[in-house]
């Protein structure tokens, strides 16, 4: 995507990090939203190896990045760098979004509420059984949400036994 508006020193920067993150649709989605809303902002994807996570998080503050989303494999490990963790993220054991407030790192998890809200919008039936493909961080959040909604049954299908 070409950023049609000139990027300046005042442009707000948001990003997603993961290993890999370059495949993420987040930049396309966010940049389209920024354009539609007339925001002076840009959203980028950065591949960040696990051993570079701490530097990436602290770099967020150093470079004035306004918000950061996280994908695999960083959602659990990043928690130790947070000054405050939202109760839901703490219960799920995973953070997928970071913002800085008053110089402090705040970690959130939007996987569970976003997924459950989407299911409810499409007529979620708690009397039905659900199949969840995958057992990573996002899947854990979705399983948590489905369990709290009282679904009849939940089947988790994964390629490996490690999760």
Question: What kind of region is each of these model predictions?
Answer:
Residues 2-122:
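Phosphate/diphosphate ligand-binding glycine-rich loop within oxidoreductases
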Residues 18, 107-109, 119, 123-151, ...:
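Glycine-rich adenosine-cofactor-binding loop
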Residues 48, 159-160:
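Short beta->alpha hinge that forms the Motif I/post-I loop of the SAM-binding pocket
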Residues 163:
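Conserved short alpha-helix immediately C-terminal to the canonical SAM/SAH-binding motif I
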């Amino acid at each position: 995507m070409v950023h049609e508006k000139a990027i300046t020193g005042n442009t707000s920067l948001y990003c997603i990090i993961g290993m890999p993150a370059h495949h993420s649709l987040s930049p396309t989605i966010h940049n389209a939203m920024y354009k539609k809303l007339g925001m002076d902002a840009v959203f980028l994807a950065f591949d960040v190896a696990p051993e570079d996570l701490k530097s990436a998080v602290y770099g967020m503050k150093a470079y004035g990045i306004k918000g950061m989303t996280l994908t695999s494999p960083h959602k659990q490990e990043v928690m130790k760098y947070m000054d405050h963790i939202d109760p839901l993220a703490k219960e799920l054991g995973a953070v997928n979004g970071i913002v800085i407030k008053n110089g402090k790192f705040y970690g959130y998890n939007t996987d569970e509420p976003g997924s459950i809200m989407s299911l409810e919008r499409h007529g979620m039936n708690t009397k039905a059984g659900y199949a969840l493909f995958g057992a990573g961080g996002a899947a854990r959040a979705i399983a948590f949400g489905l369990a709290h909604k009282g679904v009849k049954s939940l089947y988790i299908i994964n390629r490996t036994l490690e999760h």
